[in-house]
Amino acid sequence: MFFASHGQKQLSRIPSPYCGNAEQFLFQSKLCCNHLASETKNVIQKLTTGEYNHYQFTDIPLTETVPPTPHTYPPPEKIPPYQAEGVIGSVAQSLGRMFGYRENCQHLIYDIYPVRGYEQSSSFINSRKMLGFHSDGSAHTKLIPDYTLLFCIRSDPNSINLIADVKNIVRKLPKWVTDELFEPHFLHTVSQNPARTILKPIHFLEEEQHPITY
């Protein structure tokens, strides 16, 4: 993914993307963009032109120690290095402008962790049934990103990644279902602090296409 020596050296300089370090994190991870391998830059180019709708990078070079499974959520803030976050930052800034939402603690990166003792729970912190990656921000009602990046730091060789285009799925729904999606009957949370919700449709037409609002 990176030119080995220079890229790894720059990744070791990445500061925390959390709690007021956004500017330094963006600056240092932007420098990593210069060290992306030509194959990676080619993939990013195809994403920006729309030739690719999605792409899964594998064998990302990380040397940091994976932290132990936490006992609480959110877990204590991790200590350096922040190589995984640097990879996200460099790819994100190659695609455009990286940003975070106020409702996600104003962090640039929203972390999902498994929590010890909740392996079988019906929540996103379980790990034995499914560790759910929340990408709610990709359906934000006010500020919709062009790309959503998901990074799995604990890769399971036996896991299965399922990728589907929601627009293709919606086209297969019965008409009575899609008609309902056009009605303003759906409650959207637009802010958690202070709490604020609005009623909007999930579905709308744009140049005869069917974008999904949420």
Q: Which residue stretches match the model-derived regions?
A:
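Long, hydrophobic/aromatic-enriched structural stretches that serve as scaffold segments
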Residues: 50-77, 90-101
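Short secondary-structure transition/capping motifs
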Residues: 28-33, 76-80, 84
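Residues that form generic nucleotide/phosphate-binding pockets
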Residues: 46-47, 90, 94, 180, ...
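Glycine-centered helix-coil hinge/cap
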Residues: 41, 97, 171-175
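A gly/proline- and charged-residue-enriched helix-loop-helix capping module
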Residues: 78-125
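Active-site environment of non-heme Fe oxygenases that use a 2-His-1-carboxylate facial triad
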Residues: 1-31, 35, 51-57, 64-66, ...
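Short, charged/polar micro-motifs that form catalytic or ligand-binding hotspots
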Residues: 73-81, 137-140
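A short, acidic, amphipathic alpha-helical segment used as a generic capping/interface helix at domain edges
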Residues: 36-47
